[in-house]
């Protein structure tokens, strides 16, 4: 009997190992390569050959079947960074870049260090109390796994749509969309004096939630939190706005988690959906929610964003998490194509950055989501840094007698922000050299986080190459990057591995990147509202910060500066100064930049060739796998969308664009806006030749009489 048990034990061990090995091999064989995926690992031989010994392994212990729960996309994991991308830094090093300062900078740096010693001591005093946890940035510690074969086409379409929408947003923004002070005053009621809430205990929150709030270092509710949390806990619809960095994310997550503490434990269902305009903001919101509810039993979060693994998201949504944080496109995809995902029991709908959600790029998706969501009674909350008061937009969102909350007057920058302006005049060609000069001047050791905003993705990429060739560590963040590249850029920026981040307005909305010391506006934004969002990345949560803006000679640039100064005068806080620049030094640096033009072109060409080689390898491997698993791939149901390609293009084309593009030519934003203005204006009557000659004939007839 004893011998029989021993043999059975050994055979069971061998069988279990063979089964696991076979399943792993089958999983590898079932994998179809995509452009954004890793290369397949080669099989190193059958693992069962190692188990052919007849001896019993004394260290073998039976364990329970492990189920890996989703714990966030942790970019710090080593096994995530296997994605093949073009090594741009390697190309720059081969061209002599990223090696330090250019010739002649060493001596000047010593002088600058002596001048900046006093400033460094002041900064140490300011930063002494900044040991707080980087809460929201942990949301970027999210590992991005590669997409499988089914989602490749959808992901490419999402990336193209996002890149197009980013370009469209740069073109479509006009000052006519801004509300006047009278319209805002009419929309929001006059403020009434209420009791000031001095602690989260006064909000009557549950103990598990209070423990999570305390662990995050929250002690006193911010103004938006104190105003909105009690109303949200009453179940009323909310339209709320506050300045950036005021804690809007926690303002809606805290009442939601408090509500879910009392949910029916027997039934698992998705009860809350949080919509965000960008993937990065969705990842951040999901991570903040997990930390707030870490001590709440049976509280689950789901993430549904484009660019990340579709199959993993489907498996996660299959468990019906309580709160799903999503971007509009991927949410519609899951509702239509994931049979196990249901929103029948939805109770709360949140739209973060609501004004941007209502812009043209998200209008169609929002309408479709509102049609897909059940019509039963639900709570809807809109949170944003700015709140557009267009009545038709609020009606479309189907709000039921919403409570309107506006904390802090709109169009105000942080009180501890120093706004500096550099007048470019007719020196547009010197801007790259000026940027390098200022970066070396304000942070010679590259120990502070600096965000540089540009208007175009192409300029962001070119500046990264230029500054890299001049010896600076720089990363980029914009819509043309893959999701893995975006997350890696922010992770490097967070850890100060790369202290300078060049980005478009993609990162200007909602993202809480902590401890950013300086914001530089390389290109002036389109409106004062976008300017506030950009400079709002620094001087957050009561810290000091500085913004440096390059101002051109256009009327638009000047009006934004006037609005910023006017806002400071009304606010009676903050500071605005004109920064003097040593233009002779900038011109010397520009001559160095000009001398590297051929090198820049070589880097761009080499990068393009490397990308083509990588894509060819991926396509070759993908074709090979498709031939092996053709039947299985074609047997899977095709994913559907609520719009055809023709309907998408038609929805994006406004009547003005249709009239301007009759012959298939693309029109830039200036021509389109000029056409709109001409169409809106009443046509003035212009005298014809006969009209001008009529008075003369009348005068002659009078003389004859």
Curated annotation (Swiss-Prot):
Regions of compositional bias (Basic residues) in chain numbering: 662-673, 695-705
The enzyme's E.C. designation: 3.6.4.13
Protein's UniProt keywords contain tRNA-binding: no
Predominant location category: nucleus
SMART domains for the chain: DEXDc (SM00487), HELICc (SM00490)
Compartments it resides in: Nucleus, Nucleolus
Catalysed reactions listed for this entry: ATP + H2O = ADP + phosphate + H(+)
Enzymatic class: hydrolase
Domain Helicase C-terminal: 416-588
Composition-biased stretches (Polar residues): 652-661
Gene3D superfamilies on file: P-loop containing nucleotide triphosphate hydrolases
Sequence similarity: Belongs to the DEAD box helicase family. DDX27/DRS1 subfamily.
Protein name per the record: ATP-dependent RNA helicase DRS1
Gene it is expressed from: DRS1
